[in-house]
A protein has these predicted regions:
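N-terminal Rossmann-like NAD(P) cofactor-binding subdomain of oxidoreductases
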Residues: 1-69, 173, 195-197
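Structured loop/turn residues at secondary-structure junctions
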Residues: 23, 79, 120, 186-187
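A generic structural signal for alpha-helix starts
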Residues: 26, 122-123, 189-190
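C-terminal substrate-binding/catalytic lobe of Rossmann-fold NAD(P)-dependent oxidoreductases
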Residues: 40-179
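Conserved small/polar residues in nucleotide/adenosyl-binding loops
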Residues: 201-207
Length: 211
């Protein structure tokens, strides 16, 4: 399982089929990786607030899966997500530490992740924001994850090619070890942009390897 910014080194010349996770996993996985590296993580609670898609219903219908068959343009719909398993596959050090949940909301695009962490190391809101700004700017995440203090809303990330955009205004910290982050993402375009980038990398591997 590949998640950009988490385990890119897993791509090889022998990779005939690449499983690319989910848009949620790609939005939050790289952030969890750098936080785990700097502070250590005990537990993660992850809620994706997701725009509806063509797998949702536009009108209430009868059938199995009562919630999923409700009108997506009129309801906030709780649903399950496998993003925790995808992230744990890409970041084995977080295995059995992540609980994930999803809510589909009546917007066609533009989604967000409410990320709550119990850290191993004490910190503060300002320290975490400064660290995330620096690490995103200085390493290979700069074209994958972004950071902003702009007071944005969901429609502002429509068409954004980043996997995720951290909302610095919304960062919270309690008791120096309980952290909340908000991450915005275009649930279609950001994910598609990573697929294109990874596909290009895979295609150029023979050149890089001198084959």
């Amino acid at each position: 399982m590949l998640v950009s910014g988490c385990n890119d080194e897993s791509i090889s010349l022998e990779s005939d089929i690449i499983s690319f996770g989910s848009n949620t996993a790609n939005a939050v996985g790289p952030i969890l990786k750098v936080i785990e590296s700097e502070y250590g993580i005990n537990e993660v609670f992850l809620t994706t607030v997701h725009g509806y898609s063509n797998s949702n219903r536009l009108a209430d219908v009868a059938g199995a899966g009562f919630r999923k068959n409700r009108a997506a343009g009129e309801n906030i719909i709780p649903s399950i997500t496998n993003s925790s398993k995808v992230i744990e596959s890409a970041l084995p050090m977080l295995k059995d530490k992540i609980a994930s949940f999803s809510m589909t909301v009546p917007v066609p695009d533009g989604s967000t992740i409410d990320l709550t962490l119990n850290l191993k190391t004490k910190t503060s809101k300002d320290e975490v924001n400064s660290y995330l700004e620096k690490v995103i700017k200085d390493n290979s995440l700069k074209n994958i994850i972004g950071f902003t203090y702009d007071p944005i809303v969901s429609s502002d990330v429509v068409g954004n090619s980043l996997s995720g955009l951290i909302d610095g205004l919304s960062t919270m910290c309690i008791d120096e070890d309980k952290l909340k982050l908000i991450i915005w993402f275009d649930n279609g375009w950001g994910y598609a942009s990573r697929i294109i980038a990874v596909s290009y990398t895979h295609l150029t591997l023979p050149t890089i390897a001198g084959v």
